[in-house]
């Protein structure tokens, strides 16, 4: 019995010594790791964002991601005020993206690399009609700046980088002559073949063939509406291989439905850049779709339910 008690004392003492040694070892490792982190060369950069001519209403702030082009640097992801600020970045060569994060429907995904970072919107929900379930929302205001070669040196002086973001969302408005508007109760609209996603690294709108929801209504002898999409026309990829359509589901006053499809491929085709203009050509934030004079929708007559109010 006494031998067991003595043995337990020895084991307890041994465990105590082991714990002390382990604690000392962890302390040494922790100090060493802190020294390594403290010695890791981190300089910085001052980013100034110029919004003049871009928008009169500044976003809440921006997200800035630096992607290393070599083994010297490492990925840096941070948030700055709308007008920019200072951020710590290790020396090296970088690719970088900057965008506003205060969007309502735009979702950024694929942030792991410059080659995959992309902005898209989600599916339409809450509209109360099954016809809208396969549609996606048009994007709200989204501003992007991309930098394909930023060199961060080891000097103590903080360099300043002047950057001007650009809007990558365009609003299109349309008006289609319509006969029989008295038969129309409501309209569900979408556009197909336009860019519902935006590749930040490539600076291009991407079409993944999801119809984009359109705001629609009745005007004076017309069905009118608008939609937004990613990228101005000259930035959208593969436009020559895609046909664009306005798709309208017309709900008539008796509850029946009529579909109308209007091709807008030529109307939304981007103008060719003039020699020497390049990226300096100002982009239009709103474009009116001009349709041929003979383009017209005829809504079939239906029996209008009697007015029971009187």
Regions found by a protein language model. Give the residues of each.
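Hydrophilic extracytoplasmic domains
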Residues: 241-310
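Structural motif
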Residues: 48-59, 175-183
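C-terminal motif of bacterial Sec signal peptides marking the signal peptidase cleavage site
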Residues: 28-30
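A sequence/structural signal for flexible, mid-protein segments enriched
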Residues: 136-220
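Bacterial signal peptide processing site
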Residues: 32-35
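Short, low-hydrophobicity acidic/polar segments
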Residues: 74-167
């Amino acid at each position: 019995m006494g031998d067991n008690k003595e043995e337990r004392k020895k084991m307890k003492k041994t465990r105590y010594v082991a714990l002390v040694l382990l604690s000392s070892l962890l302390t040494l490792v922790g100090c060493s790791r802190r020294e390594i982190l403290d010695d890791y060369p981190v300089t910085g950069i001052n980013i100034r964002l110029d919004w003049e001519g871009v928008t009169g209403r500044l976003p809440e702030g921006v997200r800035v991601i630096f992607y290393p082009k070599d083994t010297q640097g490492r990925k840096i992801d941070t948030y700055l005020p709308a007008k920019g600020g200072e951020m710590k970045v290790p020396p090296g060569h970088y690719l970088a993206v900057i965008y506003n994060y205060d969007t309502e429907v735009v979702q950024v995904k694929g942030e792991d690399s410059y080659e995959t970072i992309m902005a898209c919107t989600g599916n339409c929900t809450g509209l109360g009609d099954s016809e809208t379930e396969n549609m996606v929302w048009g994007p709200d205001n989204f501003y992007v700046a991309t930098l394909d070669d930023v060199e961060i040196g080891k000097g103590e002086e903080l360099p300043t980088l002047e950057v001007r973001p650009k809007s990558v969302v365009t609003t299109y408005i349309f008006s289609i002559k319509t006969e029989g508007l008295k038969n129309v109760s409501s309209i569900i609209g979408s556009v197909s073949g336009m860019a519902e996603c935006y590749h930040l690294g490539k600076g291009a709108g991407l079409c993944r063939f999801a119809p984009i929801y359109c705001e629609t209504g009745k005007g004076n002898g017309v069905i009118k509406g608008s939609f937004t999409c990613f990228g101005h026309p000259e930035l959208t990829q593969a436009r020559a291989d895609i046909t664009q359509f306005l798709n309208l589901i017309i709900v008539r006053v008796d509850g029946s439905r009529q579909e109308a499809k209007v091709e807008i491929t030529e109307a939304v085709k981007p103008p060719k850049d003039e020699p020497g203009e390049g990226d300096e050509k100002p982009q239009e934030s709103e474009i009116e779709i001009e349709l041929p004079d003979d383009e017209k929708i005829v809504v079939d007559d239906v029996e209008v339910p009697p007015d029971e109010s009187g």
